[in-house]
Amino acid sequence: MLGLPNELSGSQVPGATEYEPGWRRVFKVEDLPGLGDYHIDNQTAVPTSIVCVIALAAAMDISNGKQANSIELYDVTIGRPIHLGTSPVEIETMIAIEPGKDGADSIQAEFSLNKSAGHDENPVSVANGRLRMTFAGHELELLSSRQAKPCGLRPVSISPFYDSLREVGLGYSGPFRALTSAERRMDYACGVIAPTTGEASRTPALLHPAMLEACFQTLLLAFAAPRDGSLWTIFVPTQIGRLTIFPNSSVGINTPASVTIDTHLHEFTAGHKADLPMIKGDVSVYSSEAGQLRIRLEGLTMSPIAPSTEKQDKRLYLKRTWLPDILSGPVLERGKPVFCYELFGLSLAPKSILAATRLLSHRYAKLKILQVGTSSVHLVHSLCRELGSSMDSYTIACESDSSMEDMRRRLLSDALPIKYVVLDIGKSLTEGDEPAAGEPTDLGSFDLIILLKASADDSPILKRTRGLIKPGGFLLMTVAATEAIPWEARDMTRKAIHDTLQSVGFSGVDLLQRDPEGDSSFVILSQAVDHQIRFLRAPFDSTPPFPTRGTLLVIGGASHRAKRPIETIQNSLRRVWAGEIVLIRSLTDLQTRGLDHVEAVLSLTELDQSVLENLSRDTFDGLHRLLHQSKIVLWVTYSAGNLNPHQSGAIGLVRAVQAETPDKVLQLLDVDQIDGNDGLVAESFLRLIGGVKMKDGSSNSLWTVEPELSVQGGRLLIPRVLFDKKRNDRLNCLRRQLKATDSFEKQSALARPIDPCSLFSPNKTYVLAGLSGQMGQSITRWIVQSGGRHIVITSRNPDKDDLWTKELEQRGAHIEIMAADVTKKQEMINVRNQILSAMPPIGGVANGAMLQSNCFFSDLTYEALQDVLKPKVDGSLVLDEVFSSDDLDFFLLFSSISAVVGQPFQANYDAANNFMTGLVLQRRARNLPASVINLGPIIGLGFIQNIDSGGGSEAVIATLRSLDYMLVSERELHHILAEAILIGKSDETPEIITGLETVSDNPAPFWHKSLLFSHII
């Protein structure tokens, strides 16, 4: 009879009978060195496999000497892992088997396994379940042959796989690192254990724990590709529906021949549906040569050892948010304040402060804030919550120690990151005076001061306040209406306040919001100014604080519609600029002009015609010369968002050039109309030059030279990339339960992921252009799994291998792979006609066609640009035109995160991708469904997977991680697709952004320098 050696199975408990046998064992690390090869969270632990093997071995001792043909453990429940400390702590494990039914051919019983850490500790259940042993001579019938493995399995490098398990807290070494090779695709894995020599191989075990542990490992491999992030925490076995072993096969790591492990994961229970998420699958172990079944695991369930927390959430989704510059609406004209009553749309002063602060922090991340005066707890709490990581510090200055302690006490329970100081704001300090004890010493360093309950005409207080703010910083001041002239004389009041503020170094009243419910108070916004800030605020009304004798170059005016606005802009610039202002009509004229002595360039050529549309070689040469040789460029586009997708493509190209040459300053300005914005364009150009000059100096002013701006309805909008909380919640609820909340933290229902079955119909056909590779196959499987049945895949050169389509056809799907070039309109018309003649109506279209050709922009050729543009630009336009009359549920375009950050050496690729963003916005403006997906690097599929077998993937992954790119798993790809389909018909911006890692110890990569990402790093 085969069984475990005594050092694992233990000795029989005194008093046990033939029908109630039991064993006891005290485990110590020093006694069982082999157990040191398994760690959970860096702690030595008893593998779950040992629990199962002990039960199997003990079962042999109730067989009454009969030779068992099979042993089954079923309905097995497994408790928490048993940790073994390095100190001499004893953990006692006991097993008691209570017979159930027995007969000549089989025995059935129940078993339980308990542990205790000492005589005074009550036993804790480790595992329990039922067992069955069969004795009839039917072994050959039980040992079924191996089935054909699923198609599309891809090789996995073993060392990175085990390393990825170690990164989440599962450490395997020695015999427990048993897999020698493996393959996988999502939900399937195949592993091989080769014959082993050494001490472990001489263990005469019925089933070595390492063999069973390898089965568990393959289920994890089926769930997640190495380092794809899907395995976010430690998963261990918690249930086994049935474990069947055939003793005569004696499968262990000492097996003289290799064995193959086939695993199919067939169920994932998300965290929002249970206390813990679960994965469940079936595992079969075969002899590699004969292909005969040796071990069968059915209903193997693995779960995290503890509930996930917010720290383990993955912030995969980002969104581009445009908010107005707080000063871009009402402006000062000839020293007169112009007021806006409804700027914030809020009735109460605290809400006005909150709304204004949000706009300020949108542009200026990491604000250093000083609140002068006590306030309600709600205001402080709301400000801290609204700003979050966008706030560098928040200091509350109180009039006295008693008021400070009172404020501290009221906010104590909120655990907010607040500093407290005592400040007599009415005391005037002259240069050389020392602040009183407890007062802030960092004079002139605050970005924003919130002055509460102020007197509007108190010059000493305002002067002292000005000394605390850096130039460019802001003052938000609340004033009680009773302290001012009655509202009937409000024009006189505002003028007086405006003059007082200007007299102490502020801009005056930039914005004023009164309480419309009771006229009890009003909120004033003003900016701390010096000679530089005055010019940046109003370039045409201030003396430039820098020389203006250089040469400016203005490009544009070749068309009739742009000629007059451009001449107006040129004349406006001459009011301020003393140097030469040169006007050339088009980029082609740059071929005869050098740019070495040009200080800055204003490119208005997109107002004439989109540069990338019908791009000629001469125009490309001029574009190349402009972006390669210029130092400062303001690149103006016209409605790139919803009218001119080719101009959106040019934006992507400029982003890449900026990232590749950080010594240049390339600013993008999109205007919503050509006429009427000439003054704003001229101001923006001068502001860009002035901002660059100021940043080149030693100024500590609060000012940003924005990489991108947009003008909508006369207001200047500023973009920032922010976390997309709603979509991240829908992703992370797969890991844990979390509440969906609105901006005021009103709890609603639990967050839920999108149900993909609601997105597809068995009575519609879905067209995937340029998606015949691994990613397209994965998407096709997902569509079929989600209820779709008819899919057409087009490719210029489709793969002849149709095994994967036959696999899906066995599930009732109809897959057609057609040879067609997405850039050729007639070929796609033919595809559509074939579909309509033989398949259901078309319900969705996606374009995943792409071509890459990376190089420095200085080395980019006209041909390389055109080649890369065609699949994404021409292909997307063809799909838009050919399928525009179909009632589509989705129109998906696959872009890349590189288009968002501006990836160096990929200017052509970024241009192609960002064109897609423009086309999607244009389609939505036409009320057609559309969405674009800016994907991060996919792991487990495609390029990274294809180089995995040679070990090259580790180098690629290391490079991507060094750039703080977030790896996207295949499961997350499907989640992204569902979000993209849903957003394509909504009122939201139809853009999904993924793939940036925001928490990293790496040196800051290139994209961290862009203000676009200042809120996520």
UniProtKB/Swiss-Prot annotation:
Q: By its UniProt entry, which InterPro entries does this protein fall under?
A: NAD(P)-bd_dom_sf, PKS_dehydratase_sf, PKS_DH, PKS_DH_C, PKS_DH_N, PKS_KR, PKS_mFAS_DH, PKS_NRPS_Biosynth_Enz
- GO BP term, example: fatty acid biosynthetic process
* Region of interest: N-terminal hotdog fold: 6-138
**What does UniProt report about how this protein is used?**
Fumagillin and its derivatives have been intensely studied for their potential use in the treatment of amebiasis, microsporidiosis and rheumatoid arthritis. They have also interesting antiangiogenic properties by the irreversible inhibition of human type 2 methionine aminopeptidase (METAP2).
Among Pfam families, the record links this protein to: KR (PF08659), PKS_DH_N (PF21089), PS-DH (PF14765)
Pathway named in the protein's UniProt entry:
Secondary metabolite biosynthesis; terpenoid biosynthesis
For the region Dehydratase (DH), what residue ranges are annotated? 8-306
Query: Do you know what upregulates this one?
Result: Expression is controlled by the fumagillin biosynthesis cluster regulator fumR. Expression is also under the control of the developmental and secondary metabolism regulator veA.
Protein known as = Stereoselective keto-reductase af490
Q: Please report the organism this UniProt entry assigns to the protein.
A: Aspergillus fumigatus (strain ATCC MYA-4609 / CBS 101355 / FGSC A1100 / Af293)
